[in-house]
Amino acid sequence: MAVIFYLSGTGNSLYAAKSIAQELEQCRLEGITGYLKAPYEVQDEVVGIVCPVYCMALPPVVEAFLQQVKMVPQYIFLVVTMGAMSGQALGQGKELLKQRELRLSYGAQVALPDNSIVFPSPQARQEKLLRNAPAELGLIARNIKNKYDNYQHLDRGFLWKYGGTAAGMWVLDKIKQFGKLSCADDKCVGCGICAEVCPAGNITMAAGKPAE
């Protein structure tokens, strides 16, 4: 049996997780935030984590998951989705698991359209990424199915580790300058889907609109 724990904000990582799961036999999907709310001992022999890259690193909630998840699988894989660069994300995942005497057997990255406000991708590039994604995810899934091991190649070295951290801090500083997130009242129909699907539970509804 196999399980893929995923975190997805815009849908890229959920799409990747579903694509990989379809290629594996008897594989189920579980949300990382759901697991953290109700943790249990994972019995599956194959455990995967699929998540986006945030500021060239793993999202804090994924970091917390890797520090807390109860598991002793035979094979662990980590797949990250990104707009341009994965930074230190794979090496970070490897190190977090190593600290718990667990081994990240396989790590991979796949480029998909990003939602960066600071560095938005041109439309032509986004369309190209979407065309290439099925083949890239298919290869990743086959590698996982065949228990491919690239443990020795997951470290990015000094430049990626500390350069990624510096770049991430710079991006976060730019994001803070955009101010508070608000809803476009003339376009919002009050469906509540944003509150339902937000993986971190950061959106609440008030009077039929997302509360600010």
Report residues per predicted region.
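FMN-binding flavodoxin-like domain, especially the glycine-rich phosphate-binding loop
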Residues: A2-I4, S8-D173
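Generic non-transmembrane alpha-helix signal with a bias for helix starts/N-cap capping motifs
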Residues: L90, G190-C191
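Ferredoxin-like iron-sulfur electron-transfer modules
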Residues: G168-G190, E196-V197, G201-E212
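Non-catalytic alpha-helical scaffold/packing segments enriched in small hydrophobic residues
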Residues: E136-L139, I193, V197
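A broadly tuned "polar low-complexity/structure-edge" signature
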Residues: M1-A2, C198
